Amino acid sequence: YQFNLSNEKADFYYDLAINELIKIQSLKLDKNIFSYFDDNLLLYNWSLFEKFFINNFLENKIHNQSLEILKESYEKISLNLLDQPKVICHFDYECRNLIFKDNKTGVLDFQDALIGPIGLDLASLFKDLYFFWPKEKILTWYENYQKKIEKKLNLKVSITKLIEYIDYCSIQRQFRILGKLSKVYLDLNRTNRITDFPVLLNYMISTSEAYEELKPISETLLPLKEVLNERIAKIN
């Protein structure tokens, strides 16, 4: 999928990806099959970030007060996610996990599927680490999705609220990925993904700046950019 994307073809492929995602989101919320994206998972994701990214990878180069600010902001994000409409989530619905064949979209790596917030897979798809699109183009995809779920999921969500859902999910996702990839590096000495860390941090900073209650994230993470770059330079 990722090898087919270009400015000329992006609308076509993202439309297919949206259609396939809505099929997944249309599935029955069967708790006998799918676990829930709940408080326990959110707390676990935070613990990965704090232990492996802050304490170990960055060698705890952050004041306790700054860490507390991040935790309080993370809790606000968590409340937002728990309050969102619930659907079946792939959990990592990014272009690298999509394939294209016979004018159809196929999905890989779906073993972590669960019942979770509607913005979760949209954040994976549109806040991709490897593809960057103009805001105007992304907005047209949001509007495309918004119209389709009103018809296919009988769910009416304003574009402002939909963007908020996606943004909050994307920040939480980046907390999780920073923690998870830091653990992978520390446990297995795999360095191939640490170059993604500045991209993740920049996503968190730029996205949180748009929301008054999340601005402390941006203000707290900005000074860490230099610390992170120095740490990566030492490893490489």
Where are these regions (language model features)?
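ATP-binding pocket architecture of kinase catalytic cores
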Residues: 1-39, 44, 55-61, 82
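Hydrophobic packing residues in well-ordered alpha-helices of helical domains and bundles
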Residues: 10, 14-17, 42, 67-70, ...
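All-alpha amphipathic helical-bundle segments outside canonical DNA-binding/catalytic cores
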Residues: 34-40, 158-170, 195
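Glycan-recognition and catalytic cores of secretory/periplasmic carbohydrate-active enzymes
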Residues: 34, 39-43, 95, 100, ...
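Active-site activation/catalytic loop segments of kinase-like enzymes and analogous catalytic loops
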Residues: 47-57, 118-155, 168-188, 200-207
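ATP/Mg2+ or Mg2+-diphosphate-binding catalytic cores
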Residues: 179-236
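Secondary-structure capping and boundary motifs in well-ordered enzyme cores
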Residues: 13, 85, 90, 114-115, ...
